[in-house]
Structures are given as structure tokens and as C-alpha cells.
Amino acid sequence: MASAAIFSSLRRRRSPSLEAFLAPVDLSGVALVQTLASISSEVVSCFTSVRFSFQRKNARSLIRKIEIFVVLFEFLVDSNWGSTTTRTRARRRSKSSVSESTALLCLKELYLLLYRSKILVDYCAQSSKLWLLLQNPSISGYFHDLNQEISTLLDVLPVNDLGLSDDIREQIELLQRQSRKARLYIDKNDESLRESFYSFLDGFENGKIPSSVDLRMFFVEKLGIRDSKSCRSEIEFLEEQIVNHDGDLEPTGSVINGFVAITRYCRFLLFGFEEDGMEWWIENNPKKPRKGFVAQEIGDTFITVPKDFVCPISLDLMTDPVIISTGQTYDRNSIARWIEEGHCTCPKTGQMLMDSRIVPNRALKNLIVQWCTASGISYESEFTDSPNESFASALPTKAAVEANKATVSILIKYLADGSQAAQTVAAREIRLLAKTGKENRAYIAEAGAIPHLCRLLTSENAIAQENSVTAMLNLSIYEKNKSRIMEEGDCLESIVSVLVSGLTVEAQENAAATLFSLSAVHEYKKRIAIVDQCVEALALLLQNGTPRGKKDAVTALYNLSTHPDNCSRMIEGGGVSSLVGALKNEGVAEEAAGALALLVRQSLGAEAIGKEDSAVAGLMGMMRCGTPRGKENAVAALLELCRSGGAAVAEKVLRAPAIAGLLQTLLFTGTKRARRKAASLARVFQRRENAAMRSGVYGFVGNTNGNRDGGFTTDVSVPISISISVPVL
């Protein structure tokens, strides 16, 4: 028996109830035939007048079969079949209860078939046209399976023992003969359309863009997709299938991705920038600040990749995870390129690389493969065992890339010369395209999108501004695009302007995230910090922003703190004060402590941090309750405060309550680097020869001094490690 469960996985919005898969054990006799009459009548009334885009003949044939069942069930209801009286009469006639039991079992099985028929017909009525077209052979097979099961059931059903009238019995027997003769039917016209759709995919794969005449004939004339709204609905449905796709289904997620790209291209090629209500809102609310334009779209369509599966450098799903000497995992291509560019530190932790060897992380790769299979995502590793499989999976990706390139060309034209509404829609689409894949980010920038997006940053329309700054953020993740953005005249200043006075909260947060992304390049850190109001706005966002805004701000401030020339700007702009205040916030305390540990290495920074009343208490709180990495950052900051902050600041640290106990705990339970920092700080205490502390923690440290590793004496500048990532929106 064909499984009906497949239909529930294909349409997330309308899942069938559990009744679709379980026989009605609690129904018998009169109640059962009444239920069957109700279900069959509902199917006929709901779908008789429906105009099916595809599977017309199969759907109509199934509905006609159900119409005959309606007549059967209504007769059984009218004759009170299954009641005590009718059962007694039947037993007298047949002198056996076998036929009655057989009939009851058949009717219960028919209950399941009717429910599955309803699900299948409803699926054909509600699904997108393109999806039905792609699934045409499979869905035809589902109809044939149902027909075969109906035929088998009618062969078993004891028709002669149901007490039917001659007319109804003749209809049932005719239905039985027709069901036996029925064959799998696949509409030739539908198959021809499906082949045309695949030919468009092949054309893009081979670098040959189909003509607008052919595309219009296919989408508008043949499929009846006549406006932008309908086209967008088709795209959203296909994207939904990528999220929910079962690994057994065809086509694969990567192939569907190619069809999504083609449909998106046709949307703008054939219908321009007609939109379902967005233009009206843009034109009538140009200055109204509103929260969450971008956030409303995030998560509804695209699947969220677990952060442990994302490469910290490329921010894409890792296809070949490898481990470096610091223990961090990166995608092979990304970390290899990082090392080839002359970097000798870990991108995530800042630690020096002991060597350039990389070791495959097979355990993580297996987890990624399992997750991709469960999520219906094609896992395209460049280091698979089968080159042919890798090549086959890459072909549809090429088609998607070419179709997206063609779409980007149209979008940029409207971005340059279109109306305000068209520019806003174009910016939104570019943002979505730049959301995934370095190829998308690369050719969007190469096609010239950045100058036009830069102009939209100063737009007085909230939606346009938010989409443009978010698109800029997504583009900046690609390394080469960072220089394109920084070299574009006034682009950096415009991003800072959005940070300072953006029309939506999300726009301000995404501007901060963009600055964090750009500041990953060392030579840009100083340029960013000296822009008027930049540090001040980041400090304000860290103090008053949303949890996500605080995270964006603290990571940007951390990056700026890594440049020694930015120390004075961090102090003047309130960055130091906001970082000290952030030590109380669990969500950003670790990064704040890391930034302070960097700034405090300079005497100017140490002096400024020492003047903050809550600095020492905040760092000690981090030592007490922070994460292992946060404790490392906190003890490192306190160590540098004692060394560079002057006698008064050192005295404040040494006299802090509970410092002895915290150091002792850290010396035993901290990470290797935290223990080294704690030992160095303890030696600073000893050199101060503070009598009060000598009777406390020094007794402990003095006893361990003779046995500690000599390496502690020189290990006083271990880089600070924090975990940070760029959001892709």
C-alpha cells in the first residue's frame, strides 16, 4: 500500500490530521457509513468545480470514482446498514458473519483511501504550478497507486451481501471493471512543459540565456503566471520545498535551487517591479520608522544552519572541515587561503599558529552530512570520494549562478534608474541573493551594485535604507568586497551615518555589524575609528541597544581595539566606558573583557580603564562567573592594569575583596592560558610586597612558586581569545 505520509512532508502549511493514517477502530456499523458518506460528499463538493492546473484527468477520474462511493454510502445510511436489525437479517440470509466482517474491514480500509484521496486532490489544487510540473510523473504515480488500491478493495468487498439496489450494484461493478483496466496516465502536454522547464535549466548551465519570448510563452501563456505576485508565490513555494525536502524525492534541492533562480529571473524580466503591496506602502510611508522589515522575512523561508557547522571565515556551511594547531575548525579552502596570504595567527582566537598543518575533522563532517540529509540539503564537498557525484551535484549550481547573474543585471539597472519603490525592491532582492554563497556576493559587487546601494544608505525611506545597509553587510563578508566598499567614495561615512541615525533599529544594528565585518582587515580599523561619531554611536548601541544590537556593537568595538592607534579614540568616544559597563551584561561580557584586555596594554588605556569605578569589580565578576574564555580575558586585563595603569590602579586591584580566592581557584581550574595569567598576576602581587595580601593569597602562591613551570615567568602576553561571528541577514 502506498504511503500517504509523503503528502504531509510536501506541504508544510497544510498537514493532514492523524486520521489520514489510522483506521477508525472506534467506528463501526451505522457510525462508520455515516462518516464515509460525510467524507466522500465533502471531497466531491469541494473539488468538483476546481480548475486544476495539472493532473486534470487523474483528479477528475478520482473524483468521479468518489461520486459513485457517495451514492453507495448514502444508500447504506438510508438502509441503516450496520444496525442490529440489518445485521440479524444479513446473518439469516448468509447464515454466516464472515461476509459482514469482511464488509466492515473493507469499509474501514475505504475510510483511509478516501482520506488519502482528499489529501492528494487538495495537494494538486493548492500546490504551486511549477512544483506540480516538476513532480508530474511522481504525482501521476500516486493517483495510479490509489486506483490500484481501490480496485483491490472492490474485488474483496462483498457487494452482493450489502443489500444494494440493482442500479447501485451495477455502478459499483462498472467502477470495479474500470479500475481493473486503468493504467498509469501521465499527461503528454504536462510532460512537454516539464521538459521545457528543464531545457531552460540546461540553457543557463551552458551559458545560453533563453529568450524572453520563450520564457513568456512558458510562464505566462502556458502556466498562467501573469503577474509578479504569482511569480513570487511560486518562488516561495519552491524555496519551502528546499527546506522540507525529503532525501528520497526528486529533483534534488540543488536542482530546485536552479529552478528558483530561473523563476526569479523571469519575475523581473517579464513583470518588472510590480509588487504585491510594497510600492503602495513605500510611496505612502516614506519616512515612517518601523521595526523589523528585514527581520520579518528571516527564518520563514530559509533554514538556519547550526553555528558549529559554519566556517568562522566564510560564514558558509563547511564542506571540508579541518582542525588547525589552535584546535579551531575551519573550512579547508578558507583557512588555506588565510595561511597563504601570510597570516600566522588563528582567525578566531588570535593565537599564534605553531605550524601550518591542518587535520580533517571527520567527526564534524559526518555530523554535517547527517544534518544536510535530514534537512534535504545537497552537501557539495569538493573532497568527496566520487568525482562524478561531485560534478553532477555542481551542474545545477552553475545554472543557478548564471540565472542569478542575469537577475542581478536587471536589479542593478532598476537600482540605478528606477523609481523609489523599484530601487527598494531591487535592494531587497540583492540582499537576499547576497545572503548565501560567496559566488553571489562576488558577482553582485563585480556587476556594480555597491555604488548604488551606497546612495540608498542616505534614503529617507526606512525600507530602502534598511535593505541597502543589510545588503552591504552581506556583501562585505566576501573578502574582496571589503576593499570595494572602503574604496567607494563616502560609503564608509554613509554606513556610520546609518549607525548614528538610522531610520530603523535593524538598520542601525546592521550598520554596526557591517563595520565589524569591514574592520576584520587591519588597515581599515583606524580608518573606521576616526570617522566622526563612529565610536560614540557604537558605545551608545552597546549601552542601549537590543541584545543583538549590543552584540554587533561589542564585536565592532573589539575589532577596533586591536589596532594600537585607536586607543585614544576609544577613550574619547566613550568606548572604554561602555565596555566597562558591558561587563555586567552576560551576553556581551566576554567580548567586552577581551576588548579591555587589549586596550589596557597601553598606558593610556590602562589609565582610562583604571579611572572607571566599576572596572575592577566588573572584571572580578567575570573571573567569578564568566565563561572559561571570559575568565582568561578578565585576568589578563587585571594583569595589564597592574603593569601599565600606575601604582594607584595596581593598589585598587590588589586590595579588591576576594581576589586571592579567585586567583587560587583559577590557578587550579582555569584553562592553561588562564592559569598562566593568574600566576603572572600573583607574581605582581609578590613584587608589591603588600603585607595584607602576603598573609592571604601569597602564602598559597609562595608555596607553589618553587614548583611552577619556569615558562610562567615569560608567558605574559598570550593573545586574548573570543568567539565572534558576522550575522548574515
From Swiss-Prot:
**Record-annotated U-box domain positions:** 304-378
Which species is this UniProt entry from?
A: Arabidopsis thaliana (Mouse-ear cress)
Q: Which InterPro entries match?
A: ARM-like, ARM-type_fold, Armadillo, RING-Ubox_PUB, Ubox_domain, Znf_RING/FYVE/PHD
Highest taxon above the source species: Eukaryota
Q: Which GO terms describe its molecular function?
A: ubiquitin-protein transferase activity
The name on file for this protein is U-box domain-containing protein 17
ARM repeats by residue range: 438-477, 479-520, 523-562, 564-601
Q: Which residues cross the membrane?
A: none
The reaction(s) catalysed by this protein are: S-ubiquitinyl-[E2 ubiquitin-conjugating enzyme]-L-cysteine + [acceptor protein]-L-lysine = [E2 ubiquitin-conjugating enzyme]-L-cysteine + N(6)-ubiquitinyl-[acceptor protein]-L-lysine
